[in-house]
């Protein structure tokens, strides 16, 4: 057999093996418990990554904003924290008093130290220590809510007003939102002369 024939056979064998492994892997159905575990793992990773950002920004730059018409660094992160809790509350049907931008009952029978009103506009929450507290707490609450939701209910439809989707979709939207706003702050950190944290993909 010629060298080229051997090479072709080896290539065919490799492709067949890869296809077989792919088919075998794709045949493994993921369970609701596995999805929940992945949600928790990703939220824990996201918390660590966001804390990297918060720690990287100098305390005296938390009020920095690239242009006057947008949120400061502190406000971006406080908005992230507020919506971490809000969207996950929607996902699990936890009692919500009103739409974001107005007053929200953060306590709801729990001992959560949130200021009244919309968090990012709280004058007492803008310092580095306060922002880190609220952001860190928001991730803990999100993880708590996810752990408390039976994966068998992921397909149920829920929402607020006319905005309806599955619980699973709301959980995805909550994660997407915090990723978006953390990403927006990358340029804030660069503009004050600090190197942003490296990605935490795993």
Question: Which residues does each PLM region occupy?
Answer:
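Bacterial N-terminal signal peptides
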Residues: 10-22
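Short, contiguous alpha-helical
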Residues: 40-44, 48-51, 63-115, 157-202
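Acidic/histidine-rich alpha-helical segments that form the ligand environment
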Residues: 111-157, 169-177
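Solvent-exposed, charged/polar functional surfaces in cytosolic regulatory/catalytic domains
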Residues: 49-52, 56, 141-145, 184
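N-terminal secretory signal peptides that target proteins for export/translocation
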Residues: 1-7
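Sec/Tat signal peptide C-region and signal peptidase I cleavage site
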Residues: 23-28
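Short, low-complexity N-terminal intrinsically disordered segments enriched in polar/charged residues
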Residues: 29-40
């Amino acid at each position: 057999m010629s060298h080229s024939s051997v090479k072709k056979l080896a290539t065919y064998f490799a492709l067949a093996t890869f296809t077989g492994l792919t088919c075998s892997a794709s045949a493994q159905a993921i369970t609701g418990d596995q999805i929940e575990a992945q949600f928790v793992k990703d939220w824990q990773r996201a918390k660590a990554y966001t804390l990297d950002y918060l720690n990287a920004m100098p305390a005296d730059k938390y009020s920095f904003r690239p242009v006057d018409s947008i949120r400061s660094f502190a406000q971006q992160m406080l908005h992230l924290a507020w919506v971490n809790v809000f969207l996950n509350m929607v996902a699990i049907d936890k009692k919500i008093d009103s739409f974001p931008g107005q007053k929200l009952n953060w306590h709801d029978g729990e001992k959560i130290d949130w200021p009244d009103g919309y968090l990012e506009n709280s004058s007492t929450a803008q310092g580095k220590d306060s922002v880190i507290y609220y952001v860190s707490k928001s991730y803990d609450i999100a993880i708590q809510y996810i752990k408390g939701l039976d994966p068998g209910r992921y397909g149920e439809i829920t929402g607020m007003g006319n905005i309806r989707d599955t619980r699973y979709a709301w959980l995805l939207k909550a994660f997407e939102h915090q990723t978006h706003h953390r990403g927006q702050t990358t340029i804030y950190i660069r503009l004050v002369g600090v190197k942003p944290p490296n990605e935490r993909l795993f």
